[in-house]
Design a protein with these regions (language model features):
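Conserved Rossmann-like nucleotide-cofactor binding loop
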Residues: 35, 198, 282
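FAD-binding beta-loop-beta segment adjacent to the flavin cofactor pocket
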Residues: 238-267
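Short pre-catalytic strand/loop immediately N-terminal to key active-site residues, enriched for Gly-Thr
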Residues: 269-275
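Redox-cofactor binding/interface segments in oxidoreductases and associated redox assembly factors
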Residues: 51, 70-71
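SAM cofactor-binding core of SAM-dependent methyltransferases
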Residues: 4-55
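Class I S-adenosyl-L-methionine
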Residues: 56-68, 75-239, 243-247
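Acidic-aromatic/histidine active-site loop/patch
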Residues: 286
Length: 297
């Protein structure tokens, strides 16, 4: 199998393929971030780097040999957490570059499979992307999958693909305490980590805005069971400010949230590790989707 990965990052797609027993004959990676690319080369030295996706028409690629193309196109323009400018933003324009490349591959090899990924977004954006993807590429199956089914992180993502037979992953029952190096947490699933996680967070934004997962020392947080008027069990958060300490998730813990092997991103600064992990795929979700490829069955 020959694979073309757009916006490859630290090559979560190769990790996913490896986990389902697929070793590509050729793996082309389009990525401009030098730190993410260095992690890819450290772990997968046979990767063929292509550089920036906007230079795709200069690439030395035999398009007819590409069997799979994967693209997690930039989310900042489409995300509910961003400016929501869609393709009016320069990064949003990369959606059209993505479609152009996939269309070019399918013209050269109609049997090629594709997988596109982006954040859960407002309905109008999702419908816009789905419509234009269908217009450009033909039959498209759309799936909304939460990484919480395979990891300890709430991370809802849309996937558009021509791979058939995809169902929701089975819930592995992984909770946040399972992946911590130390400390305790007040919830079962982490907030979605993003590329800005390295900036840290504070208690106010964590509890009021549900942002940037924090971990507490054992004597810093206690749970008090409570029941609402409907009899549903809920949790009150009680903080002992005097004795409380809190911290960010470690890079290792973020690797585990993304179902990346421990230590995979070692070799760059923690800032860069957080950034690439926040930008990356949840590996086990991609592995679940790609396990439906005919070459794998």
């Amino acid at each position: 199998m020959n694979v073309l990965s757009l916006f490859d990052g630290m090559s979560c797609t190769q990790l996913a393929l490896k986990s389902i027993g697929v070793r590509p004959n050729k793996y082309y990676a389009a990525e401009w971030d030098k730190y993410a690319s260095s992690i890819t080369q450290k772990n997968f030295p046979d990767t063929i780097p292509l550089g920036d996706v906007t230079d795709w028409f200069h690439w030395d690629v035999d398009w007819s040999t590409i069997d799979l193309i994967v693209a997690g196109f930039p989310c900042q323009s489409w995300s509910m957490a961003g400016a929501r400018l869609g393709d009016r933003d320069a990064r949003g324009q990369l959606f059209w570059v993505t479609l152009d490349i996939i269309q070019h591959v399918l013209e050269a090899n109609p049997n090629a499979k594709f997988l596109m990924e982006n954040v859960k977004m407002k309905a109008a954006f999702e419908q816009y992307i789905t419509h234009h993807t269908q217009e450009a590429l033909g039959v498209v199956n759309k799936h909304l999958i939460n990484s919480a089914l395979v990891s300890a992180q709430n991370r809802q993502r849309y996937y558009w693909t021509n791979i058939e037979g995809i169902e929701q992953p089975k819930d592995k029952g992984v909770v946040l305490k399972d992946i911590l190096e130390n400390g305790v947490t007040d919830r079962e699933k982490a907030h979605c980590i993003d590329a800005n996680y390295f900036k840290g967070g504070n208690l106010k934004s964590y509890f009021e805005k549900h942002r940037r997962q924090l971990v507490f020392s054992p004597n810093g947080l206690c749970h008090v069971g409570d029941a609402d008027l409907n009899g549903n069990q809920s949790i009150k958060r009680v903080l002992d400010v005097k004795d409380m300490t809190w911290r960010k998730l470690t890079p290792l813990e973020c690797e585990r949230l993304q179902t990346v092997p421990d230590g995979y991103t070692e070799g760059v600064s923690n800032t860069q590790r957080y950034k690439m992990l926040g930008n990356g795929f949840t590996v086990d979700v991609i592995a679940h989707i790609l396990s439906n490829l005919e070459q794998v069955k």
